[in-house]
Structure formats: structure tokens, C-alpha cells
């Protein structure tokens, strides 16, 4: 009985020491990857006057809906997302400009098309 109590005390002491050591380990106070990226983006936006662009570009998007499984973007535009009828969530993008709905029965397909001009 005395040996068991001694082991129990030693085990508890060891667990307490390990817990205290974990508390003493330095923690990264810089933050998460998300906060670091956010900080860098803010820095770049704050300094954008240092690097003025001579070209002004606009980002425009439109949705193209077609019957069947395929919906294609107009020339010069790229697919950024797809939606399919009958609650089908299985689709892929072909050649960068066409949405292909993969479900067996399909009544419509929509392609979200964007361009930077």
C-alpha cells in the first residue's frame, strides 16, 4: 500500500511539473497566419501611393444561364463559379470558360463569368 501511494504521489507531481512547463513555454504573440496576412495587406494598401499605377483596370462579372449541363462564358471572360439545377453540387470547369454540371439529370447550368479589363 505504501508503494502504491508513493507511485501515485510521484505520478501526480510529474503531471503538475509537465503542466507548469507547458505554461512557461513562450507563445507566438505575432498572431495567426490570418492576422499576419491581414497586416501585410493593410501595409500594401497604405503604401500604394508610393507605386502609382499608370493603368486603370476594372473587374466585371456576369452570370450566364443555359438549359442542359453546360454554360459557357462570353469570349474574354473566365469562369469563377458554377451553379446547377436540381440541387446538383457536382460540377467542373472546362477550358477555363465553361461550366459542366456532372449530375445525371440536369435542367439548367449557370456560369459566373468575370474579366479584368
Curated annotation (Swiss-Prot):
Expressed in colon, lung, spleen, pancreas, ileum and bone marrow (at protein level). In colon, found throughout the crypt and surface epithelium, including goblet cells (at protein level). Highest expression is observed in bone marrow, spleen and lung, with lower levels in other tissues. Detected at low levels in granulocytes, but not found in monocytes or lymphocytes. Has very weak expression in white adipose tissue. One of its GO terms (cellular component) is extracellular space. The keyword S-adenosyl-L-methionine does not apply. InterPro entries: RELM (IPR009714), Resistin-like_sf (IPR036262). Induction: Up-regulated in colon and bone marrow in response to a high-fat diet. Also up-regulated in obese mice mutant for the leptin receptor LEPR (db/db genotype). Belongs to the resistin/FIZZ family. This is Resistin-like gamma. The lineage of its organism: Eukaryota, Metazoa, Chordata, Craniata, Vertebrata.
Amino acid at each position: 500500500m505504501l508503494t502504491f501511494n508513493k507511485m501515485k504521489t510521484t505520478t501526480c507531481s510529474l503531471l503538475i511539473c509537465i503542466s507548469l512547463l507547458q505554461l512557461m513555454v513562450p507563445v507566438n504573440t505575432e498572431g495567426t497566419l490570418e492576422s499576419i496576412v491581414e497586416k501585410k495587406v493593410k501595409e500594401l494598401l497604405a503604401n500604394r501611393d508610393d507605386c502609382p499605377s499608370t493603368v486603370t483596370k476594372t473587374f466585371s462579372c456576369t452570370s450566364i444561364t443555359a438549359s442542359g449541363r453546360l454554360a459557357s462564358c462570353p469570349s474574354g471572360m473566365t469562369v469563377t463559379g458554377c451553379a446547377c439545377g436540381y440541387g446538383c453540387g457536382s460540377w467542373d470547369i472546362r477550358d477555363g470558360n465553361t461550366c459542366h454540371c456532372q449530375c445525371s439529370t440536369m435542367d439548367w447550368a449557370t456560369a459566373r463569368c468575370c474579366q479584368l479589363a
